[in-house]
Amino acid sequence: MKSIREIYKIGKGPSSSHTMGPERAATLFKAKNPDADAFKVILYGSLSATGIGHGTDRVLREVLSPAPTEIIFSKETIPGSHPNTMDFFAMKNGVESCSMRVESIGGGDIRIPGHRDAESEEVYIEHSFAEIADFCKWRYIHTLSEYVELNEGPEIWDFLMEVWQVMKNAIDEGLKAEGVLPGGLNVQRKAKFLIESEPEEKVPALLEFQKIAAYAYAVAEQNAGNGTIVTAP
């Protein structure tokens, strides 16, 4: 089994392929070109067709800022290419200094054509919970958290704390936000209204249900609004 780091992923909503993947690609390209004074990104296929609705352009501009970024939604078809293909260009004094083609292959993962894909390391050699139980019994491991730390190292707890903090921030920010969600469908945010409304009957179970619903709306609306969230398969 792969690392827990491969399960929980932090990034911009609302789509692993249309926002998280492009965000990761833009972050990588920006790091490779720290001296660029402008960028250009050409989106193809599905990224071009639905990128505006997903906010792909907004996420790319946010990551590549403060340098100005030109986004082109191309209708060109590249034979044999992945449907979520992007071309990145770095500019310096009006001259192209670097380019990179990236494919957003789903799940927030990206691939650079022509480069060998780095295989995700198999951190856990066991393949079932029965095998994990036998291993823990043999090694006198009493909790699953001990088993996780043995395989992942103690730094996994810092990562999971970051995941938990991002989850909480998504709730907090979603409960405060107002207005219409991006995307052109004129959908009004509801989380703030839900958390501030008082039901006619103050039954504890109903109050708890209302709070849970408000939290769920808060995260969903942050996701829809290109907020930073945690995604998991």
Give, region by region, the residue ranges found by the protein language model:
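Buried hydrophobic packing segments
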Residues: 22-29, 60, 64, 216-219, ...
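N-terminal glycine-rich anion-binding loops that anchor highly charged ligand groups
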Residues: 1-3, 33-37
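Generic N-terminal amphipathic, Lys/Arg-enriched alpha-helix
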Residues: 2-14, 146-147
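Mobile "lid/hinge" segments at catalytic clefts and subdomain interfaces of large enzymes
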Residues: 44, 55-64, 68-92, 96-151, ...
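Conserved phosphate/anionic-ligand binding catalytic regions in large, soluble enzymes, centered on
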Residues: 8-28, 225-233
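Beta-strand segments within the central parallel beta-sheet cores of soluble alpha/beta enzyme folds
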Residues: 36-45
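Generic structural signal for well-ordered, non-membrane alpha-helical segments
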Residues: 15, 19-22, 26, 53-57, ...
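Accessory "access/gating" subregions that flank catalytic or transport cores
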Residues: 162, 168-233
